[in-house]
């Protein structure tokens, strides 16, 4: 008996540029498990090609956004997916851009799962325009968050039963042939992310204190 795999349209950021959300998108795109379990189709949501372009506007960006909208619309009509997975932004100008994409998907009758790699909804929810947009943005969708604590950011608009928690991860790298190097020298540790409280800098410093 031929079993049809569910068709999923993944609308997500992939490199370039390289950042957390785009790397997770690349891991999903390259995942044997994901691609063998579902009939997968992909649209790269990224408009910026360099890190310094993220969050900025301009005519070039506007044309890029319009092209992405057309790409998404074309993919939905062609694939006719059972589910659309999208990694949108939660606040600011990038949110307004993604709001248009999400509302277009809803008008096309799509079932939507949003995977958030950032937060900021709670900081904007008391603004009249943003509040109105969030109500329509989150209506009838499922959410994937990176941690339980992040639910506080969206709880005004999304029921807890519509939220799934999936921490970020990286592919397993075999180190079987790497001999551990023991030395009395002071170790050098690289903190490769933003120096922000929400990125875990305080927990990182606490961990270093324990290691000492």
What do these predicted ranges mean?
Residues 44-74, 90-97:
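A short, charged, and often flexible helix/loop element on the N-terminal side
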Residues 135-177, 192:
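Donor nucleotide-sugar binding/catalytic pocket of nucleotide-sugar-dependent glycosyltransferases
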Residues 103-108, 126-142:
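Membrane-proximal helix-turn-helix segments that form the acceptor-binding/catalytic region
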Residues 1-48, 79, 109:
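N-terminal subdomain of nucleotide-sugar transferases
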Residues 9-11, 180-210:
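Conserved donor-binding/catalytic core segment of Leloir-type glycosyltransferases
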